[in-house]
Design a protein with these regions (language model features):
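Flexible gly/pro/ser-rich segments immediately N-terminal to CXXCH heme-c attachment motifs
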Residues: 208-225
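A generic alpha-helix preference that emphasizes hydrophobic side chains
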Residues: 21-23, 75, 157, 241
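Conserved beta-strand position repeated once per blade in WD40 beta-propeller domains
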Residues: 75-77, 157-159, 219-221, 283
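Secretory targeting and sorting signals
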Residues: 1-26
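Beta-rich carbohydrate-recognition and catalytic domains
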Residues: 29-71, 80-153, 162-212, 233-284
Length: 284
C-alpha cells in the first residue's frame, strides 16, 4: 500500500480519537448537556500538544447554538464541501425544547445536525455561518431515526466527504447502547445531499450490515486522493481495530466496487479480506 497511505491512515485515526477516552458515556439520555449543572465548567483541560481555544456549540459558545435548540452535541464530523466551506455533522444533539419522552429523553433530542462555516481563523474558535433548521427553527435532524431501543436508538454520522457537487455522510444505525464505550449497530450506510447539506436522502443500497467483514466498517473516516475515496473503518465502539478500503470517486455508492487492503494488496468486493492496519482506535 505504501508508506504514504499508511501515514495518512495513522494521522486520520489519530485525529478521530476522542479526547474523553474509552470510558466516556455514549448514551445521550444519560447526559445533562447544560454546562455548570452537569459539573463541567469552562474549556476542557487537554494534556497533549493541542489546547482548547473555544467552545463550538452550547451556551458558552460564541455561536449561541442554544437559540437553535443545540445545547449539547456529540462528535462533530468536519469536511470540505468542495468549495472551500466546512460542513460539520454533529451526532446526538440535545436542547431545551419539545422533549422526546416516548424515546426516553427529557431533552429535545436529534440524532444528527448540520452546520456550515467559512471561518479561516480558528485561533479563536470556529464561527458558524448557517445552520440547517427544521420548520420550527431548531437544528434539523437531517436523517431521521425512530429512537426505539433495540430497533434503532440513533442514526449517528461518522464521516463526510464531497464528491463533485454531492455531499455524502456515512452514518451508523445504533441498535442499543452497552457499557461505556460500547454499542451495537444494525448497519452503516450513506446519505447524500445535492443542496450543500440542506436536505439528505438515505441510500439503502449502501448499507453494510454489522456482521462479517462489513462489521469492520460500521464507523468511518474518509480521505480523498488521486481519484479515490479511502474509507478507514472500525467495528462499533471504541478502542477497536482500524481497517482501510478504497473506491473510485464516481463509485462511492457501489459497494461491489470497493477494494480492501489485505496487508499485501487490494482485493475487490470482499470486506472480510481487510486486514487491521492499526489497533486501539478511540473512535471514528
Amino acid at each position: 500500500m505504501g508508506s504514504r497511505v499508511l501515514t495518512v491512515a495513522a494521522l486520520t485515526v489519530t485525529a478521530s480519537v476522542l479526547v474523553t477516552g474509552p470510558t466516556a458515556l455514549a448514551d445521550p439520555n444519560a447526559i445533562n448537556p447544560i454546562a455548570g449543572l452537569n459539573g463541567t465548567f469552562g474549556l476542557p483541560q487537554l494534556h497533549g500538544r493541542a489546547q482548547a481555544v473555544a467552545q463550538v456549540t452550547g451556551m458558552s459558545s460564541p455561536n449561541m447554538t442554544q437559540n437553535v435548540t443545540m445545547i449539547g452535541t456529540d462528535l462533530g464530523i468536519m469536511w470540505d464541501n468542495g468549495r472551500g466551506e466546512v460542513l460539520t455533522a454533529f451526532g446526538d444533539t440535545a436542547g431545551v425544547g419539545v422533549p422526546n419522552l416516548l424515546q426516553g429523553s427529557l431533552w429535545s433530542w436529534r440524532s444528527n445536525a448540520i452546520v456550515r462555516s467559512n471561518d479561516r481563523n480558528l485561533a479563536d474558535g470556529m464561527n458558524f455561518d448557517s445552520v440547517v433548521k427544521d420548520a420550527v427553527g431548531q437544528t434539523k435532524e437531517v436523517v431521521p431515526s425512530p429512537k426505539i431501543p433495540f430497533v434503532e436508538i440513533s442514526r449517528i454520522p461518522t464521516a463526510g466527504v464531497a464528491v463533485g457537487d454531492t455531499q455524502y455522510l456515512n452514518l451508523m444505525s445504533v441498535k442499543n447502547w452497552g457499557p461505556a464505550g460500547t454499542w451495537d449497530t444494525n448497519f452503516s450506510g450513506l446519505a447524500a445531499s445535492t443542496d450543500n447539506g440542506e436536505n439528505w436522502a438515505a441510500l439503502p443500497e449502501t448499507h453494510r450490515p454489522s456482521a462479517g467483514g462489513d462489521r469492520n466498517f460500521q464507523q468511518s473516516a474518509y480521505l480523498k486522493d488521486n481519484g479515490y475515496v479511502y474509507q478507514y473503518g472500525t467495528p462499533p465502539g471504541r478502542s477497536t481495530l482500524g481497517h482501510v478500503a478504497r473506491v473510485r470517486d464516481a463509485d462511492i455508492t457501489r459497494l461491489g466496487e470497493y477494494e480492501y487492503w489485505t496487508g499485501k494488496d487490494w482485493k475487490k468486493g470482499d470486506p472480510a479480506a481487510a486486514a487491521p492496519i492499526v489497533d486501539g482506535v478511540g473512535e471514528l
